[in-house]
Swiss-Prot record:
The record's free-text note on cofactor binding: Binds 1 heme group covalently.
Name of the protein this chain belongs to: Cytochrome f
Topology class, membrane: Single-pass membrane protein
Name of the gene: petA
Signal peptide: 1-35
SUPFAM superfamilies reported in the protein's UniProt record: Cytochrome f subunit of the cytochrome b6f complex, transmembrane anchor, Cytochrome f, large domain, Rudiment single hybrid motif
Length: 320
C-alpha cells in the first residue's frame, strides 16, 4: 500500500513538472514569436498617439524607413491593395532572445480610415492572393476593424507586405463619406530594445550604473556577463548584469564612468512610420466627369465638321 502511494506521488510530481514546463514554454514562446503586435495591442487602446506617433516606436528605438503605396482613389465597396515596404539589408543578422544571431523578422500596423477594413477572402482575386502569400492579418481590436496588424514574419520573404482592403459604401454605411482620407503605417524590422514594462531586451546597449574601476568580469555559463565595478574612494561594489548577446567594450582594471557603455549596440533593426492619402470617389461624380469629357470631345468633333463644311462652301462659291 505504501509503495503504491509512493508511485502515485511520484507520478503526480512528474505530471505537474511536465505541465509547468509546457506552460513556461508556451508563454515564453508566444511572447517571443508574437512580440510586435501583442505588446502594442495589450498596452495601448490605440496604436497612434495624439501627437501622431505610433506606439511601436516606444520599444523600437532606432529610426528606419518605411513606405506605403495605395491607389489615389477608389470606388465604394471595392477591394484594393495597400502595399507596405520595409526595406533593410538582407545580409544582416540580429541578436535573438537566447543571445545567438539569426535572421530579422518584420511587422507592420496599418491604420485605415473608419469604414475601411480587411477584405473578406471571397472578395480577394487570385492575383492578389498570390501577392499576399501565407500572411495572416488580424484586427488590432475586435471593435477596430480599420486597424490591422501583421507580424512578426520572416523579413527575407515579406519585406513587402500586401494588405487586401475593402472600401466602405456610403449607401449602406452612414458614417462613410466621399472624401479624401489619410492612411497611416508603421513598420519595423528586428527586435525591440525595450519591453513595455520598461526593462531592456538583450538587443540594446548596456551602460555602467556606477563610476569606478572594473574589478571583475565573470562570463556566465549560459552566456552573458557579471561586471563588478568598485568605487575607488570607499570600495563600494556594484554588479552590472549583461544578458547573452551584446559584446563587451570594457575589460578588467579599466576605469569607467556612470552611464559609460559597457557593450556595443547590437541592434541592426528599427522602426519607421509613414502616411498616404486616398479618395473615396463617388461613382456619380465619375460618371458626370466622363459625360463632361465626352461632351467636350463631341463639341470638338462638331466644330471640326462645321469648319470643314464652311470651307467647302467657300471653295464652291469661289469656283462659281
Amino acid at each position: 500500500m505504501q509503495t503504491r502511494n509512493t508511485f502515485s506521488w511520484i507520478k503526480e510530481e512528474i505530471t505537474r513538472s511536465i505541465s509547468v514546463s509546457l506552460m513556461i514554454y508556451i508563454i515564453t514562446g508566444a511572447s517571443i514569436s508574437n512580440a510586435y503586435p501583442i505588446f502594442a495591442q495589450q498596452g495601448y487602446e490605440n496604436p497612434r498617439e495624439a501627437t501622431g506617433r505610433i506606439v511601436c516606436a516606444n520599444c523600437h528605438l532606432a529610426n528606419k524607413p518605411v513606405d506605403i503605396e495605395v491607389p489615389q482613389a477608389v470606388l465604394p465597396d471595392t477591394v484594393f491593395e495597400a502595399v507596405v515596404r520595409i526595406p533593410y539589408d538582407m545580409q544582416l543578422k540580429q541578436v535573438l532572445a537566447n543571445g545567438k544571431k539569426g535572421a530579422l523578422n518584420v511587422g507592420a500596423v496599418l491604420i485605415l480610415p473608419e469604414g475601411f477594413e480587411l477584405a473578406p477572402p471571397d472578395r480577394i482575386s487570385p492575383e492578389m492572393k498570390e501577392k499576399i502569400g501565407n500572411l495572416s492579418f488580424q484586427n488590432y481590436r475586435p471593435t477596430k476593424k480599420n486597424i490591422l496588424v501583421i507580424g512578426p514574419v520572416p523579413g527575407k520573404k515579406y519585406s513587402e507586405i500586401t494588405f487586401p482592403i475593402l472600401s466602405p459604401d456610403p449607401a449602406s454605411n452612414k458614417d462613410a463619406h466621399f472624401l479624401k482620407y489619410p492612411i497611416y503605417v508603421g513598420g519595423n524590422r528586428g527586435r525591440g530594445q525595450i519591453y513595455p514594462d520598461g526593462n531592456k531586451s538583450n538587443n540594446t546597449v548596456y551602460n555602467a550604473t556606477a563610476t569606478g574601476i572594473i574589478s571583475k568580469i565573470i562570463r556566465k555559463e549560459k552566456g552573458g556577463y557579471e561586471i563588478t565595478i568598485t568605487d575607488a574612494l570607499d570600495g563600494h561594489q556594484v554588479v552590472d548584469i549583461i544578458p547573452p548577446g551584446p559584446e563587451l567594450l570594457v575589460s578588467e582594471g579599466e576605469s569607467i564612468k556612470l552611464d559609460q557603455p559597457l557593450t556595443i549596440n547590437p541592434n541592426v533593426g528599427g522602426f519607421g512610420q509613414g502616411d498616404a492619402e486616398i479618395v473615396l470617389q463617388d461613382p456619380l461624380r465619375v460618371q458626370g466627369l466622363l459625360f463632361f469629357l465626352a461632351s467636350i470631345v463631341f463639341a470638338q468633333i462638331f466644330l471640326v465638321l462645321k469648319k470643314k463644311q464652311f470651307e467647302k462652301v467657300q471653295v464652291s462659291e469661289m469656283n462659281f
